């Protein structure tokens, strides 16, 4: 990665960091943006994902500009929302949250939306919205209880981690798999490269 190009990730999510690394992108800095993620009244899940990703990117960008010795950087932010119809599911933090989410998702289709927002060093804002449709099998009570006991769901939108045990719940998936994990790679890489970020430079020195 060129020393002239810095990438700041406005998220502390280990999953997003790992996904970027999977694409050969190593953020120069992790700067989580703490914002109020409460949906607005009657806000559509798509709109929520876009709004929160924008607010995260803008907050991180503004914070960077106040720092002494600020170096112009690309700022990348994302937010993932899971919804059944227009009903937005929470990022599960309690056992009840997780059990309620899984009960609602059991045997049904839902959608996973990710808003991606990129602010260039010059302050230009670019955004993408990615949607994935997912259908879960019918989950018996015992399976829900076992999954909740695993703790894997904690902090996850919709109360599950598709890259873990919950991968066995998926009957059908239409769209980006990495979107469900937390960051749609194809769209993220396209957004960065479209604004001149040298995505492939680090690939040249990557070891097999």
From Swiss-Prot:
EC number, as in UniProt: 3.6.1.9
Obligatory cofactor(s): a divalent metal cation
Site (Important for substrate specificity): 15, 80, 163
Family classification: Belongs to the Maf family. YhdE subfamily.
Superkingdom, taxonomy of origin: Bacteria
Places the protein is found: Cytoplasm
CDD domains cross-referenced by the UniProt entry: Maf (cd00555)
GO molecular function: dTTP diphosphatase activity; UTP diphosphatase activity
Catalytic reaction(s) noted: dTTP + H2O = dTMP + diphosphate + H(+); UTP + H2O = UMP + diphosphate + H(+)
One Gene Ontology term, aspect cellular component: cytoplasm
Keyword Hydrolase included in the entry's annotation: yes
GO BP annotations, alphabetical order: nucleotide metabolic process
Organism: Mesorhizobium japonicum (strain LMG 29417 / CECT 9101 / MAFF 303099) (Mesorhizobium loti (strain MAFF 303099))
Function according to Swiss-Prot or TrEMBL: Nucleoside triphosphate pyrophosphatase that hydrolyzes dTTP and UTP. May have a dual role in cell division arrest and in preventing the incorporation of modified nucleotides into cellular nucleic acids.
Keyword Iron: no
Name of protein: dTTP/UTP pyrophosphatase
Active site: 79
Main location: cytoplasm
Keywords: Cytoplasm, Hydrolase, Nucleotide metabolism
